[in-house]
């Protein structure tokens, strides 16, 4: 737990940096999820599907943690699912990197999911990630939320592969 906390804080503190590598973002989300598993007495599972060869690409810092936090707090924690699971997928396709956080928790209506990205909800963590994706990548970046009540939620991010940081 101590190692997970120190890793999480080390990778989260921004030191003025808005970009990080995929490898550091993976370290951050793994540390965050370890902390959450301890806090939840391992009452949910985490399944990772991470492609090789992506470690050195630059991405916006802290794009996965808010998504995982919402999946746990608003999906897994409030679900009656007997096998609560959070899936973390990172893969590449052509000139893009795809990130997905998915849960089999409570879910929500698609209308409510759409409102999260259009300033019609009170939350700001997920919307902040969406805003940063649009500022950094414009039409080349994308974030979508798909959800079904009682089935779970899938948050999907697509960004171009970059090896140099564009500063916000």
Predicted regions and their residues:
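Two-component histidine phosphotransfer core
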Residues: 1-146, 152-156, 167
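C-terminal beta-strand of the catalytic ATP-binding
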Residues: 157-163
């Amino acid at each position: 737990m101590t190692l997970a906390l120190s890793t999480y804080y080390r990778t989260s503190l921004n030191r003025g940096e808005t970009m990080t590598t995929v490898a550091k973002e993976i370290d951050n989300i793994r540390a965050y999820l370890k902390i959450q598993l301890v806090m939840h007495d391992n009452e949910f599972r985490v399944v990772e599907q991470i492609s090789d060869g992506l470690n050195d690409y630059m991405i916006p810092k802290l794009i996965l943690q808010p998504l995982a936090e919402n999946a746990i707090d608003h999906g897994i924690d409030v679900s009656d699912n007997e096998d609560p699971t959070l899936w973390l997928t990172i893969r590449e396709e052509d000139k893009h990197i795809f990130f997905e956080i998915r849960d089999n928790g409570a879910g929500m209506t698609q209308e409510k999911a759409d409102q999260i990205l259009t300033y019609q909800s009170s939350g700001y963590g997920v919307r902040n990630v969406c805003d940063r994706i649009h500022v950094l990548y414009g039409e080349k970046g994308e974030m979508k939320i798909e959800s079904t009540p009682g089935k779970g939620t899938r948050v999907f991010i697509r960004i171009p592969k970059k090896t140099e940081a564009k500063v916000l």
